[in-house]
Amino acid sequence: MSIPRELSVASGSKSISPKPSVYDYITLLKPRVMLLVVFTALVGLIVSPVSINPLYGFLAILCIAVGGGGAGALNMWYDADIDAVMERTKSRPIPAGKISSRKAFIFGMVLSILSVLIMGSFVNWFAALFLAFTIFFYIVVYTIWLKRRTPQNIVIGGAAGAFPPMIGWAAATGTVNIESFLLFLIIFMWTPPHFWSLSLFSSLDYDAAGIPMMPNVRGEHSTKKQILFYTILMAICAAGPFIIGFAGVFYGIFSTVLSIIFIHFAYRLWKSNTYDATILMAKKTFFFSLFYLAAIFGILLIEFFVWCFIIL
């Protein structure tokens, strides 16, 4: 079941404010998601084998941030009807009546187009086209096509959130390779455990909005089993940079420890057999997943700077 697109956002929200605030527009950008996008893109750009002019590097990261923000605004524009239904999202600017759908759409389109044009004009067109494809994938493939149709929405659509380190890499090198693809795979495999653990303690919200998340469609047991499965795949991918010699021993040790802890949480979630235990472990798994991804990419960055210092 999905909420009809014809459903007026105003039907469950306040009247549109005459003057949206700067904060309202910032909220449209999904700033917390943008931080993750910017950080992983920055790591991809810095650890690539080619040094980029700092000014062009700054422009590249700015374009990725602006493009990600534009995509976030377009996502909120399209999902305004279901955002109005969900407790977690009904205070967003459009369902709350702070910004009109039309303004949000124009805002998102302008940011998305500008980010691609500036990236292409000042950095390189390969990275710009990669950025354009990522925005398209997030809005059209994930938001419009998959999100309301299949419980695999997160698995396939998660690619959009995994592309930023490859875009950062492409901004510096003008191409992509196996190392950048490994960075993509880490985030791609991380996405299902992250979002499905969230959906386990937010299933009523998703059910009310008619979004076919895994717990609502396949059930709690299947969801927990798949969280464990994808966590193991993610751990294997996280070991990849060390295995191929892209990352050193420092990364290898710490990424292994972090992956074991993540698998431990996912295993305990899978074995939980009461409602309270499931909710508790789902929350622990979700919040650890946030730390895990930041730590994995942070370790890569720290190790890179340590090696630079040693070489100098």
UniProtKB/Swiss-Prot annotation:
Pathway assigned to this chain's UniProt record: Porphyrin-containing compound metabolism; heme O biosynthesis; heme O from protoheme: step 1/1
Topology term for the membrane: Multi-pass membrane protein
Uppermost EC category: transferase
Entry-linked PANTHER family: 4-HYDROXYBENZOATE SOLANESYLTRANSFERASE, PROTOHEME IX FARNESYLTRANSFERASE, MITOCHONDRIAL
Organism encoding this protein: Bartonella henselae (strain ATCC 49882 / DSM 28221 / CCUG 30454 / Houston 1) (Rochalimaea henselae)
UniProt record, GO biological process: heme O biosynthetic process
Protein name per Swiss-Prot or TrEMBL: Protoheme IX farnesyltransferase
Record Gene3D superfamilies: UbiA prenyltransferase
Subcellular location: Cell inner membrane
Encoding gene (name): ctaB
Main location: membrane
Family recorded in the similarity comment: Belongs to the UbiA prenyltransferase family. Protoheme IX farnesyltransferase subfamily.
GO MF annotations in UniProt: protoheme IX farnesyltransferase activity
Keyword Cell inner membrane: yes
Membrane-spanning ranges: 33-53, 54-74, 105-125, 126-146, 154-174, 181-201, 243-263, 291-311
Stated role: Converts heme B (protoheme IX) to heme O by substitution of the vinyl group on carbon 2 of heme B porphyrin ring with a hydroxyethyl farnesyl side group.
Keywords carried by this UniProt record: Cell inner membrane, Cell membrane, Heme biosynthesis, Membrane, Transferase, Transmembrane, Transmembrane helix
Catalytic activity: heme b + (2E,6E)-farnesyl diphosphate + H2O = Fe(II)-heme o + diphosphate
Note: Carbon 2 of the heme B porphyrin ring is defined according to the Fischer nomenclature.
Pfam families in alphabetical order: UbiA
Keyword Cell inner membrane: yes
